């Protein structure tokens, strides 16, 4: 299986976090099916020119989240996740991310009405996909 990952060493986000974030998004969007094998740690590290430890950390983070499972001697596989649980995970992550953004915006003095207006403007600009 080939994973579509776009990694940037210029990003403030650590490489292992970029890897886990992008794999997580593909799993939650069901672009990677349950029980699909992931590339070996070494293969993914070689393909993206990162250290084995970086990929291992990303895979282990996703395993702790319940998105991957490891099979001794066989590697990492996407966990079987019911559709409802996938949506709950995605909603929870969205709430966490938006919570951080709202807190940062409020710390900079923006009112909730301004935050809401920005959010709604972004949604309109993005257009409806569902």
Outline where the language-model segments fall.
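Beta-hairpin "wing" of winged helix-turn-helix
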Residues: 31-36, 61-73, 77-81
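Generic signature of intrinsically disordered, low-complexity segments enriched in small/polar residues
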Residues: 19, 51, 62, 79-80, ...
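N-terminal helix-turn-helix
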Residues: 37-69
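Extreme N-terminal segment that seeds HTH/winged-HTH DNA-binding domains in transcriptional regulators
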Residues: 1-37, 43, 89-130
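Short, charged/polar, Gly/Pro-enriched secondary-structure boundary elements
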Residues: 84-87
């Amino acid at each position: 299986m080939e994973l579509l990952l776009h990694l940037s060493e210029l990003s403030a986000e650590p490489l292992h976090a970029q890897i886990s974030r992008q794999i997580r998004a593909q799993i939650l969007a069901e672009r990677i099916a349950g029980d699909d094998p992931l590339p070996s740690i070494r293969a993914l590290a070689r393909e993206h020119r990162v250290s084995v430890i970086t990929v291992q950390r990303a895979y282990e983070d996703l395993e702790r989240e319940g998105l991957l499972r490891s099979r001794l001697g066989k590697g990492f596989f996407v966990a079987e996740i019911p559709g409802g649980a996938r949506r709950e995970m995605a909603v929870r992550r969205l709430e966490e991310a938006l919570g951080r953004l709202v807190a940062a915006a409020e710390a900079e003095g923006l009112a909730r009405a301004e935050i809401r207006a920005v959010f709604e403007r972004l949604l309109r600009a993005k257009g409806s996909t569902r």
